[in-house]
């Protein structure tokens, strides 16, 4: 049990998270990301990540 007032602070939000979610919702992009990584897969489908 961890007291929510103690412990590590919340991690910084990932600036790429919205793009990661877009890629995850596209089955082809999501599959490609499993092989070559999210940023490269996103770039191939949508342009610059």
Swiss-Prot record:
Keyword annotations of the record: Biomineralization, Calcium, Disulfide bond, Gamma-carboxyglutamic acid, Hormone, Hydroxylation, Metal-binding, Secreted
Annotated residues for binding of Ca(2+) 3: 24, 30
Keyword Secreted appears in the UniProt entry: yes
UniProt-listed SMART domains: GLA (SM00069)
Domain Gla residues, every copy: 1-47
Post-translational changes noted in the entry: Gamma-carboxyglutamate residues are formed by vitamin K dependent carboxylation by GGCX. These residues are essential for the binding of calcium. Decarboxylation promotes the hormone activity.
Superkingdom of this protein's organism: Eukaryota
Entry keyword Calcium: yes
Stated name of the protein: Osteocalcin
PTM annotation (Hydroxyproline): residues: 9
Family, as annotated: Belongs to the osteocalcin/matrix Gla protein family.
Major site of localization recorded for this protein: secreted
Gene Ontology terms: cellular component: cytoplasm; extracellular region
Modified residues (4-carboxyglutamate): 17, 21, 24
Coiled coil ranges: none
Protein localization: Secreted
GO biological process assignments: biomineral tissue development; bone development; brain development; cellular response to insulin stimulus; cognition; glucose homeostasis; learning or memory; negative regulation of bone development
Disulphide linkage map: 23-29
Record's function text: The carboxylated form is one of the main organic components of the bone matrix, which constitutes 1-2% of the total bone protein. It acts as a negative regulator of bone formation and is required to limit bone formation without impairing bone resorption or mineralization. The carboxylated form binds strongly to apatite and calcium.
Binding site for Ca(2+) 2: 21, 24
GO function term, MF aspect, one: hydroxyapatite binding
Binding-site residues, Ca(2+) 1: 17
């Amino acid at each position: 049990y961890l007291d929510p007032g103690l412990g590590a602070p919340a991690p910084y939000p990932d600036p790429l998270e919205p793009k990661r979610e877009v890629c995850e919702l596209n089955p082809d992009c999501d599959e490609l990301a499993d092989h070559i990584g999210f940023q490269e897969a996103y770039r191939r489908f949508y342009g610059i990540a």
